[in-house]
């Protein structure tokens, strides 16, 4: 059963999906069940992956890692996402060459969680 806001990845083709509305069915791609991505927050290369939240005058700036994450053609952050306490979600999709950061107009106290998805190392959260 897929739940709202879970992230799944196809291990064959690399498709990544986020569940908008949960349901009882199994997510399948390329003829195989998709892998549920666990949220990491400490292990391995955390200094380049765990989101860092900075408060700004009219919102929050989310940077990926205390050390900037590479944004190369073969290794980059695909998106940065903020999940608010009221259930709303903000997301910025990124491409190779972009800065690994996103600005959201919101109050820091409204943040429930922040996460990002690295094409090589998966889903990371704070």
PLM regions with names:
Residues 63-64, 100-107:
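Exposed aromatic-hydrophobic patches
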Residues 119-126:
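Short acidic/polar inter-strand loop motif in beta-rich domains
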Residues 64-72:
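Short amphipathic, basic-aromatic surface patches that mediate peripheral association
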Residues 23-33:
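Cysteine-rich micro-motifs
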Residues 10-13, 29, 118:
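Short cysteine-rich clusters marking metal-coordination/redox-active sites
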Residues 17, 33-34, 122:
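Cys/His-rich microdomains that often coordinate metals
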Residues 1-12:
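Intrinsically disordered, low-complexity linker/tail regions enriched in polar/charged residues
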Residues 7, 16, 26, 115:
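Residues immediately within or flanking Cys/His clusters that coordinate Zn2+
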């Amino acid at each position: 059963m897929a739940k709202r806001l879970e992230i799944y990845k196809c291990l064959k083709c690399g498709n990544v999906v986020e569940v908008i509305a949960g349901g009882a069915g199994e997510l399948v791609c390329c003829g195989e069940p998709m892998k549920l991505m666990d949220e990491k927050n400490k292990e391995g290369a955390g200094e380049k992956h765990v989101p860092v939240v900075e408060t700004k005058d009219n919102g929050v700036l989310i940077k990926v890692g205390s050390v900037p994450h590479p944004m190369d053609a073969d290794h980059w952050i695909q998106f940065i996402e903020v999940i608010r306490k009221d259930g709303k979600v903000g997301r910025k999709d990124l491409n190779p060459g972009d800065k690994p950061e996103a600005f959201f107009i919101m109050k820091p106290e409204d943040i429930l969680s922040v996460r990002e998805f690295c094409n090589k190392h998966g889903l990371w959260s704070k």
